[in-house]
Structure formats: structure tokens, C-alpha cells
Amino acid sequence: MIFTKVDALVKDIDVDKYHIETVILSSDDLNKKIIRVKSDHGNEFGIRLDKGQKLQNGSAFFIDDHHVLVIGVESQDLIVISPKDMDEMGITAHILGNTHKPIEVKDAKIYLEVDPVVEQVLTQKEIAYTIEEVVLDKPLRHVNLTAHEH
């Protein structure tokens, strides 16, 4: 079976009405438009998403009237920065922009993959950070300035 669109998010499904099969992906796999997966039940599925469709933690695909395939994301260690004020946020954004690393900003925190060079720079600039095990809902991404409009 090949899925071409995300039918729902698991949070919007009455899970008591369905038998749930899950597949755990890396956050990088969420960027893929075409992927073959194997569920926790050993069933193989293809995902070839239509334009505009994106995978995320909790994406759900209806297999039939009684079965749903749900995408989960494995946890990973990430650098987590919680800037103490707007000045530190600006400095941190400038530093990270120069590294060209994909990031996620959520709830006033900056998330990015563990990188010894980034850690060294943050330490040198006295920017506090932690390494935390995190499950991302969406993949880390580069800032897309081409989408900027006025």
C-alpha cells in the first residue's frame, strides 16, 4: 500500500475506534517525500506524499476502516538554548546563522543538533545551553529567506 497524503493527526483521531500500527522515524526522515516504512506489526508501507504534504510526529494514514498507521519520531540529543533576553537572542541568532545549521525555535527555546563546534562557540560567547533528549514534531530546518515577502 502506498500513501500519498496525510489523512489526519493522531491527536484528532478517536484511537479507541482503530487498531493502531506505528512506525518510528528519525526527524531527518520527516523531510523525505518518498519513503518505505515497516510498522511495529511488520507490515511494509510506501509513502509518496503529494506536493504540499509534509510528515510530522503524529501523522496518521488510514489503512482501512479499522486500521491506522501513525508516524512517531525517535528522540535525539539536541542542544537547547534558552536566551535570557532579547539581546542574547539576537547574538545567538547571529552566531547560529553564521554556522548555517538547521534549527527549530519553539516556546522561546532554540533547538539544534549536537555539534562540538557550536558548543565551543556558545561556551566562548558565554551563552548557556543544555543537551537534552528531545522528540521533535517537525524536522529541524534551515531558515528560508526566499519565502520572505512584504
Swiss-Prot record:
Top-level division of the source organism's lineage: Bacteria
Keyword Kinase assigned: no
InterPro entries named among the record's database cross-references: UreE, UreE_C_dom, UreE_N, UreE_N_sf
GO molecular function, one term: nickel cation binding
Subcellular location(s) per record: Cytoplasm
Keywords: Chaperone, Cytoplasm, Nickel, Nickel insertion
Oxidoreductase is among the record's keywords: no
GO biological process: protein folding; protein-containing complex assembly; urea metabolic process
Gene3D superfamilies linked to this entry: Urease metallochaperone UreE, N-terminal domain, UreE, C-terminal domain
GO cellular component: cytoplasm
SMART domains the UniProt entry points to: UreE_N
Stated role: Involved in urease metallocenter assembly. Binds nickel. Probably functions as a nickel donor during metallocenter assembly.
Similarity-based family: Belongs to the UreE family.
Protein name (database record): Urease accessory protein UreE
